């Protein structure tokens, strides 16, 4: 599956003002830092302001994509072979990760991804089994910037959770 085609559509949406700045998070971003695994979707984090009543309205995104022949599927929209999930930044950590995302090229297509350290902090914060497994892989394979990671953990009150994670999953037998 060609990720670049989906990224080009996201870039077109950003240029058209349908979405603001976006960055790739989740498994696709993680696999640029650690050994790839299996994923079936592309997590595109976007900054959206809540509308009246505090609700976030994704309908302009879905309407734009429908006019171009893309259809909703499960939790996202199938865009050129990838199910893209549009994920509004919902926590200060995700907002910061979007603001500090790194510009890269994938197959000649420009995009942005979360830093490894932000991905690690998000995995720790979310704490699902697959996130914890990914966090172990980051610690063993990813070579994160420890000082940057510690600063992110401090800013988002995740230091105690990190110490607990390290003692449970990363300590030598």
Identify the residue ranges that each predicted region occupies.
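Compositionally biased terminal segments of proteins
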Residues: 1-173
């Amino acid at each position: 599956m060609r990720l670049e085609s989906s990224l080009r559509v996201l870039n077109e949406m950003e240029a058209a003002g349908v979405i603001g700045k976006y960055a790739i998070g989740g498994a696709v971003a993680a696999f640029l830092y650690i050994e790839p695994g299996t994923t079936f979707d592309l997590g595109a984090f976007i900054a959206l302001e809540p509308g009246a009543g505090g609700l976030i309205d994704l309908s302009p995104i879905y309407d734009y994509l429908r006019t171009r022949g893309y259809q909703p599927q499960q939790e996202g929209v199938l865009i050129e072979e990838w199910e893209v999930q549009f994920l509004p930044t919902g926590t200060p950590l995700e907002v910061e990760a979007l603001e500090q995302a790194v510009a890269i090229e994938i197959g000649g297509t420009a995009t942005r991804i979360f830093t490894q350290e932000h991905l690690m902090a998000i995995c720790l914060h979310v704490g699902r089994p697959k996130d914890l497994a990914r966090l172990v892989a980051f610690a063993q394979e990813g070579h994160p910037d420890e000082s940057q990671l510690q600063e992110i953990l401090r800013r988002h009150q995740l230091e105690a959770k990190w110490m607990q994670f390290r003692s449970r999953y990363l300590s030598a037998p």
